[in-house]
Amino acid sequence: MPALCLFFALGLNIGSWASRLADLKIAMSITDMELGFFLLATSLGAISAFPLTIWLLRHVGARKMALLLGSVTACLLPLIMNNTSHHLGLVLMFIEGICCAGLNAAINTYGSDIERKHDIKCMSRLHAVFSLGLAAAALISMGLIRFVSSELIVHGAVICVSLLTLFAVAYRTSEQCRTSDSDDKQPEPKLINKTTLVLGIIVLSATIIEGSMNDWSAIYLKDVIDVSPSLAPSGVLVFSAAMFIGRLFADSLRSQYNDAILIAFAGLIVSLSLATGVWLSGLYASWVSFAIVGLTVSLVSPIIYASAAAIGPGCLSLISTFGSIGGLAGPPTIGFIATHFGLTSGMYFVAASGVVIGIAALKLAKHQHTPQYASL
């Protein structure tokens, strides 16, 4: 129960401001390039978070760290939503990046510890709950705009209360399945080697796709496909719902097929489906391509996190940071591309990230029988 709350809360937090980026852009009166810098601040925060993440995991423990950083993100959200200054927005998103990166590492460490202690495979399902949080954020956004108020501060306040409630539930129930802090303080092995670099490239590319689809699909539908503002968040909804469904079945697929081959096929399907959807254009083509991308890319991150956990907690912490950087660096990259070449070109860049996943996964498939790739 606590782990489910934490994964859901992270998805709800990120999905809430991501689904309102089009409105935040208007509120701050900024261009696509400035929106790119706004999102870049989160990736810089994620990069800066790595030393703090390692220190907190060693000295505080994953459970307490998740609750602490999660509460900070909840309180940040109304400030982000009510902000009209681009410069203040950069500061707020930098802090958001630090907290989200640390929270991501903490909950994945917590999840892998549950797998180890109870001898179960649940990482994909936990990531499915994260995707459910993203989908819930999009649904809440659409519902608030349509039936309550389109004001960003109202949205921020509702999500803030919801997040704090989730963290309170996680705190009250965590005693029943908590991991010991001593487990979180294991000595960290050497982190940089061929294994972590290949795993890092894959999860970086996968989270670039995830983050870009979460942050730009609504803007793509509104600015390129020209849908109504109330329908724009449907892009996030379709993508995140598909990711949720894909991750529900990821563990069973892993028991039948080779992990590296699954990742390679996922990367290629992502590239082909998204490129085709962008080329065809139109709302329905976009929905179908977003759904296929969500179903296939959903397999990648849980497999990589599980493999990193099998190598050791240090590797898992590093890979979690790679994942946060990818998820937060992808969207501003799309913003810069959109400014100079158009948002359609930015979506093609997202599709190209799938090719990177496929190539890196083939390298894993070649070396899966060597000791350092034994978990794959």
Regions found by a protein language model. Name each.
Residues 19-33, 215-231:
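Short amphipathic helix-loop junctions that connect adjacent transmembrane helices
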Residues 81-92, 279-289:
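Helix-loop junctions at membrane interfaces in 12-TM secondary transporters
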Residues 64-78, 261-276:
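Structural signature of the two symmetry-related core transmembrane helices
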Residues 313-343, 350:
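A late C-terminal transmembrane helix in Major Facilitator Superfamily
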Residues 49-62, 145, 246-258, 338:
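Helix-to-loop junctions at the C-terminal end of transmembrane segments
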Residues 153-170, 347-363:
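Symmetry-related core transmembrane helices of the 12-TM Major Facilitator Superfamily/SLC fold
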Residues 94-128:
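Cytoplasmic helix-loop-helix junction between adjacent transmembrane helices
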Residues 49-87:
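Conserved MFS/SLC helix-loop-helix module at the cytosolic interface between two early adjacent transmembrane helices
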